[in-house]
């Protein structure tokens, strides 16, 4: 390196041209409109995937978030996949974790082999959930008309400026029959009558410390019985909630604070629609209510695997029952 090059690297203009200094009192919390945009409440109707050709349908809030898209939250992107019978699609993302839930239909997954690992092949049907680590794009081939919910952590990698090139967990399949059997066991447990949550967490033995479905993603299949009004809870992870099944009369109440009785003050109401989705921003109190006359089912997907590793999940419950 010559002297002029050294001078250019150590020059005042290069090292200090972009620096800024702020009064801490005015800059301590940049999460506000115009700076780091807050994550908004948002809901998507099942009409989004009810008709049309085979397509990937992103639930994109990147414009509101002020980040590259598609992104549903700063770290996660959710999509509906609509596949016509006999057709296929290749969902592609630079992501370490991809989660798929089969809302309806049936088909097959094929993914080519990678060095050190064999090709992947899986037959899937309604109610199944499967996760894939980093690797080649999978081909999803529909046997019957199908709707899948797909969530991945691509926006996080975009922000970090990195490529996913190493699998961090084993591809896994959670068949609907096994999930349903666990839910029925939960319902039959006498202690469930006193519980705030009738849900099963999906996990893997390779992630025993976090008890999550991947190292970044968290998934829970939950039941909300008729007549239930769940005490509020909150957490610092974002929730991308899929309404698996419900009748009118199911809803979620969301708000910033609790009153002296442990109820959400000035709550906003999100009415559920079967096959729809909504986002629960981090840090907000929320609780699910079922006044429909029938059991409802919910699948929240969160970035709680990452938050658990960072020790920043901070989950809290308004009452003593969990």
Kindly label every feature range from the protein language model.
Residues 1-73, 161-221, 231, 322:
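A short, N-terminal "cap"/entry segment at the start of jelly-roll beta-barrel domains
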Residues 78-81, 108, 151-152, 219-222, ...:
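A structural feature that tracks compact, well-ordered secondary-structure segments
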Residues 84, 103, 121-144, 151-154, ...:
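Conserved metal-binding segment of the jelly-roll/cupin
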Residues 2-42, 238-322:
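C-terminal functional regions that serve as terminal interaction/effector modules
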Residues 2-5, 143-189, 291-322:
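Double-stranded beta-helix
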Residues 56-67, 76-94, 218-238, 284:
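Conserved short histidine dyad/triad with adjacent acidic residue
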Residues 12, 69-73, 86-100, 136-144, ...:
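Short, low-complexity cationic-aromatic patches
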Residues 84, 88-126, 243-274:
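A short beta-strand-loop-beta hairpin characteristic of the jelly-roll/cupin
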């Amino acid at each position: 390196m010559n002297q002029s090059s050294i001078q250019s690297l150590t020059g005042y203009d290069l090292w200090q041209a972009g620096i800024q200094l702020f009064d801490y009192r005015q800059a301590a919390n940049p999460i506000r409109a115009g700076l780091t945009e807050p994550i908004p409440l948002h809901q998507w109707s099942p009409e989004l995937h009810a008709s049309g050709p085979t397509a990937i349908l992103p639930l994109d809030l990147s414009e509101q978030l002020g980040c590259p898209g598609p992104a549903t939250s700063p770290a996660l992107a959710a999509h509906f996949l609509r596949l016509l019978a006999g057709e296929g699609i290749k969902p592609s993302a630079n992501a370490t974790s991809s989660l798929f839930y089969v809302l309806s239909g049936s088909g097959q997954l094929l993914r080519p082999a990678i060095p050190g690992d064999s090709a992947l092949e899986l037959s899937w049907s309604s109610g199944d959930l499967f996760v894939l680590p980093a690797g080649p794009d999978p081909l999803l081939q529909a046997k019957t008309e199908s709707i899948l919910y797909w969530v991945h952590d691509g926006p996080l990698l975009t922000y970090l400026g990195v490529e996913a090139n190493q699998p961090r967990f084993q591809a896994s399949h959670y068949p609907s029959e096994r999930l349903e059997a666990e839910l029925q066991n939960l319902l039959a447990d006498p202690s469930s009558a006193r519980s705030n949550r009738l849900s099963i967490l999906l996990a893997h033995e390779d992630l025993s410390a976090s008890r999550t479905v991947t190292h970044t993603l968290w998934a829970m299949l939950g039941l909300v019985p008729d007549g239930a009004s769940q005490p509020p809870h909150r957490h610092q992870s974002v929730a991308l909630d899929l309404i698996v099944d419900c009748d009118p009369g199911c809803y979620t109440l969301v708000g910033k604070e609790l009153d002296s009785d442990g109820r959400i003050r000035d709550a906003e109401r999100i009415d559920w629609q079967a096959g729809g989705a909504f986002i629960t921003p981090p840090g907000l109190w929320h609780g699910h209510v079922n006044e429909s006359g029938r059991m409802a089912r919910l699948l929240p997907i969160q970035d709680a695997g990452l938050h658990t590793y960072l020790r920043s999940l901070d989950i809290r419950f308004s009452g003593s029952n969990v």
